[in-house]
């Protein structure tokens, strides 16, 4: 209904194969106000779309995260192998798994195509990272930057989203400020699990450098250990633990206001107030800074 359209803005997924301005116009004529561009588009092609669609139509484009190996994300591997549908936001990333080649008349005989002793990574794309190119994305006429976050932790989502938010705000305040803070942006993103980075298709066709051939693992510099749920009157926090940690370890708290605070775990108490040396995945209270996410 028209009333519903006024309340809920219709947005079209990247999986609708939105690769040219005629597609955008089609969706606009059917009530869509925002369309997510296909990952295969370059910034030049997005600029062309922007120049040929209504001014009040919004373009959303991916700025960071895993790159789907399938065209416009339309992949059935996850659904076929695990019953979890990528087209409904539940992709299990089978493109990251190891694969071997078997000739159908020789079952059990694996071809020697391995890059290492664990398999060959024929679908293993690097992760997209456009933190250095926010001005170019703005200049292309993109209205919203999309961060891919499937199967990611709260720490990943919070850190990456906060970093790009700061980068965008810094750029609109001053390009000089944005450039001067680049190492900070990169260091924050490096705290999350990630693969090697690429700029995807934004500057033209990809080449062999956009793939990872020797590993299927993530780079992991920090461990997400928990989420602060409550701050007590005596300066402690009650938090939900995600990974084990111990008294004496140095941890970093990511505050909601954007600050990172390093501190040492002085003590850990269980729900009954008993002291513990380490925390094996329950609810705990510990002296710590304000609300936020904890990592080490």
Predicted segments, located by residue:
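Conserved small/polar residues in nucleotide/adenosyl-binding loops
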Residues: 2-11, 284-291
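Surface-exposed amphipathic alpha-helical tracts and adjacent flexible/coil segments at the periphery
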Residues: 25-286, 290, 296
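Catalytic beta/alpha-barrel core
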Residues: 5, 11-19, 33-41
């Amino acid at each position: 209904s028209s009333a519903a359209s006024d309340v809920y803005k219709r947005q079209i997924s990247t999986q609708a194969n939105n690769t040219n301005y005629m597609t955008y116009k089609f969706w606009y004529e059917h009530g869509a106000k925002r369309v997510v561009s296909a990952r295969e588009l370059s910034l030049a092609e997005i600029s062309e779309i922007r120049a040929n669609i209504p001014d009040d139509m919004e373009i959303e484009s991916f700025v960071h995260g895993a790159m789907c190996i399938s065209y416009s994300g339309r992949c059935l591997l996850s659904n076929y192998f695990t019953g979890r549908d990528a087209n409904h936001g539940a992709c299990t990333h089978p493109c990251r798994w190891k694969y071997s080649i078997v000739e159908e008349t020789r079952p059990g005989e694996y071809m020697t195509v391995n890059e290492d002793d664990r398999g060959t990574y024929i679908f293993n794309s690097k992760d997209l990272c456009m933190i250095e190119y926010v001005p170019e994305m703005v200049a292309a006429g993109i209205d919203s930057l999309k961060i891919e976050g499937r199967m990611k932790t709260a720490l990943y989502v919070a850190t990456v989203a906060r970093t790009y938010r700061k980068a965008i705000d810094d750029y609109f305040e001053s390009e000089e400020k944005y450039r001067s803070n680049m190492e900070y942006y990169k260091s924050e993103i490096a705290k999350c699990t990630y693969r090697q980075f690429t700029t995807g298709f934004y500057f033209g066709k990809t080449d062999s450098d956009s793939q990872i051939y020797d590993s299927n693992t993530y780079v992991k510099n920090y461990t997400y250990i928990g989420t602060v749920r409550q701050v007590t009157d005596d300066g402690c926090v009650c938090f939900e633990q995600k990974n084990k940690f111990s008294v004496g370890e140095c941890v970093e708290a990511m505050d909601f206001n954007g600050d990172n605070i390093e501190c040492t775990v002085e003590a850990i108490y269980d729900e009954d107030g008993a002291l513990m040396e380490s925390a094996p995945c329950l609810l705990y209270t510990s002296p710590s800074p304000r609300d936020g996410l904890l990592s080490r």
